[in-house]
Amino acid sequence: MKHVEINETVKVGHVQPQTDYQFLTMIGRPVTGWKLVVKRIFDFTVGLIGTVLSLPIVLVFAILVKLTSKGPAFYKQERVGLMGKSFNVIKLRSMYQNAEARTGAVWAQKNDPRITPIGRFMRKTRVDELPQFWNVLKGDMSLVGPRPERPVLTEEFSRQFSDFPKRLRIIPGITGYAQINGGYDITPDEKCKLDNYYIKHFSVWFDIKMLVGTVKIIFTGDGAR
């Protein structure tokens, strides 16, 4: 998989915020069926267990974040969810405070200077994503699904890749098929194809395989940026 060139392949810097997004008209019909009910039961059960088990780890890294850089330990950021509905994703802060003051909304890159040393470790091991178990319990997110993007980036990518909004037909996930097979350093077009493949073939068994793959990544540190 090739690395995303922010300034060439995907120009997303300094995208101006707006309220009327064209991608909202390009999503299509939501995914329906009994498999979604099973998926939600699985998500809530595993999400509850994950919340309890990950709490000590989250608290330890929250303290480390506070001790090693200025700013809050956690942050909320608006993301686009099911059928274009916005929600706030919760993460451990892995970047320096006000990191996007100059760059605007851009994808993080490999060796991104905005990422703190402890943040780099958290991204490699996905520890920064652990607070999102709360998003799963609330129903904003699933354990497995297309990773949610920010509204301005979703709009920009949708203008370049017409199938990108179709990723919004299902609840977004903490981890996904694109992350397992391409890591974070893939283009939006590649990510779009992998995510839409997942939507077409998703099942609880598929989700279990993706979760196992994610655990392997956590222990190897592969695929992070």
Which residue stretches match the model-derived regions?
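A membrane-cytosol interface segment of integral membrane proteins
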Residues: 1-5, 144
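Glycine-rich flexible loop motifs, especially short His-Gly-Gly/GGXG/HXGH segments used as catalytic or interaction
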Residues: 5-48, 76-77, 183-204
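Short, glycine-rich, amphipathic interfacial segments at transmembrane boundaries or analogous
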Residues: 6-15, 75-114, 175-193
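A hydrophobic, helix-centered structural microdomain
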Residues: 28-98, 135, 209-225
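C-terminal terminal-structure detector
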Residues: 29-30, 166-225
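Short, solvent-exposed loop/helix junctions and linker helices
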Residues: 31, 35, 112, 123-127, ...
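Residue-level recognition of specific faces of alpha-helices
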Residues: 63, 76, 91, 114-117, ...
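A short, structured surface patch at a secondary-structure boundary
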Residues: 108-171, 210-218
